[in-house]
Amino acid sequence: MQLVDTLKIKSYEKIKEFLNQEHVGRISSIDVNGFPQIIPMNFVFLNDSVYIHSHVKGEKLDNISKNNKVGFEADRELEFLPSYFEDPHNASLADTLYVSVVIKGIASLVSDRDEKTLALNGLMEKYQPEGYYDPLQSNMRVLNAVSVIKITPQTLHGKYKIGQHMNSKDRMN
């Protein structure tokens, strides 16, 4: 079995749980010069899609209007393992334990006011779970002042490296 198979998160529910816990994800689009542009963003995962909010103008939106294929990534570093725990002279043994999700998807601007409201309220619920805000309504003018980008996954892969790649004698059980 390849190492990649060992690291794969096989449960879609676990991937969703991870995405709902993380606060920052990164959207990658292609700029006018053909280079990747990666931007950290707050996000919410709702109805099997990623939603992010944005200003109504900007490079990210320009990129998406020209090429709607995007990447999205969220990760959590669990622990850095310095090499000297294994061998005081071999730096190649340093490692990082982590969880990550990578999405390749299609980005679109949300124009439906009900969907936009759902996404923005979802963001508020995620980042301010204690409440103390008034939920948005689809007829509010404030919806005109913000863009909502929806990323519809074409592929979605989760990976976790938590020591399962180590020999059993090297793991602390």
Q: For the regions a protein language model found, what residue spans apply to each?
A:
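Short beta-strand segments
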Residues: 22-56, 72-73
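Helix-adjacent hinge/juxtasegments
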Residues: 62-65, 69-84, 91-94
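Charged, gly/pro-rich active-site loop segments
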Residues: 2-5, 82-173
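Hydrophobic/aromatic-rich structural module bridging two neighboring secondary-structure elements via a short loop
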Residues: 53-60, 65
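A short local loop/turn or secondary-structure capping micro-motif enriched for an aromatic residue
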Residues: 46-47, 59-62, 80-81, 167-168
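Extreme N-terminal tail/first-helix region
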Residues: 1-20
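A generic structural signal for short beta-strands and their flanking turns/coil linkers
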Residues: 23, 39, 46-48, 66-70, ...
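A generic structural signal for nonpolar/aromatic side chains embedded in well-ordered alpha-helices
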Residues: 19, 63-64, 123
